A protein has these predicted regions:
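Conserved class I S-adenosyl-L-methionine
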Residues: 1-45, 48-56
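A short glycine-rich, Lys/Arg-flanked "PGG" loop and its adjoining helix->strand segment in the class I
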Residues: 129-141
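Conserved beta-strand signature within the Rossmann-like core of class I S-adenosyl-L-methionine
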Residues: 142-149
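A conserved beta-strand element that flanks and buttresses the S-adenosyl-L-methionine
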Residues: 115
């Protein structure tokens, strides 16, 4: 199935948005992702005006979290049902319904913060490349692209799935992430990680309070990064 068509069902927007509140594991991950975003703003944008583009913004989760700390915020998505929910969640961000990989309506606009969450590992390889090409073109010289790979194929849970003889899930390997960035002349400057333990949205092997505590500890150990299910990459243009 073309990933472009995956979020067009009339009920998709509300049901997708509810997962981040109603599913304990996904909600836990979202709390960690918010803390990562806080750290990124502190590390890279202290005393700077932020002009933010959220690509594949969906229901506006990232936009609504960041918009009070940005000079300008723009969200782009091709799904009208997702954007219907986004418009309820945001206060002042601009919303554009478009597929930038096929019709780049942003023209020559530049942004110093571009985010793209829960998009790249779900998208087909060709779509990934098209999307990153567009985003790199709209990134200011000293700006950063922040995106996540929430389906790291080298994660602990995927390794265990394969170990017991089942087919692992589709997603992206870290090597694929690096290749995608290299081909678009981008380099990684910071990586955050979470979800090292083999838990999932459907099966929690530990009580949530314990899982949260342990994952917070494991998130501070860089050597475990390759085993994490969810990695957040901070990237910039390659130095010439």
């Amino acid at each position: 199935m073309d990933y472009r068509k995956s979020h067009l069902h009339p009920d998709k927007g509300e049901s997708y948005s509810a997962l981040f509140t109603n599913n304990p594991y996904r909600n836990m991950v979202w709390q960690f992702e918010k803390s990562f975003l806080d750290s990124i703003l502190t590390l890279f944008y202290r005393n700077s005006d932020i002009h933010h583009l959220d690509f594949a913004c969906g229901t506006g989760r990232i936009l609504s979290y960041l918009e009070d700390r940005t000079k300008s915020s723009t969200g782009v998505d091709l799904s009208p049902v997702m954007l219907e929910v986004a418009r309820k969640n945001i206060k002042r961000a601009d919303i554009i319904e478009e597929d930038l990989t096929q019709n780049d309506v942003l023209g020559d606009r530049k942004f110093n913060l571009i985010t793209a969450f829960r998009f790249f590992p779900n998208a087909e390889a060709e779509l990934r490349m098209q999307a990153m090409h567009v985003l790199s073109r709209h990134l200011e010289e000293n700006g950063y692209i922040v995106f996540n790979n929430h389906l790291n194929t080298g994660s602990t849970i995927n390794r265990l799935i394969k170990f017991v003889g089942r087919r692992g899930f589709k997603g992206m390997s870290i090597a694929e992430v690096k290749n995608l960035l290299s081909k678009n002349h981008l380099e990684i400057v910071k990586v955050f990680h979470i979800c090292v333990l083999p838990a999932s949205e459907d099966r929690m092997i530990f009580p949530l309070s314990l899982l949260r505590h342990v994952e917070r500890f494991l998130a501070g150990i860089p050597v475990l990064r390759n085993l994490a299910l969810n990695l957040v990459f901070v990237c910039k243009h390659e130095c010439s």
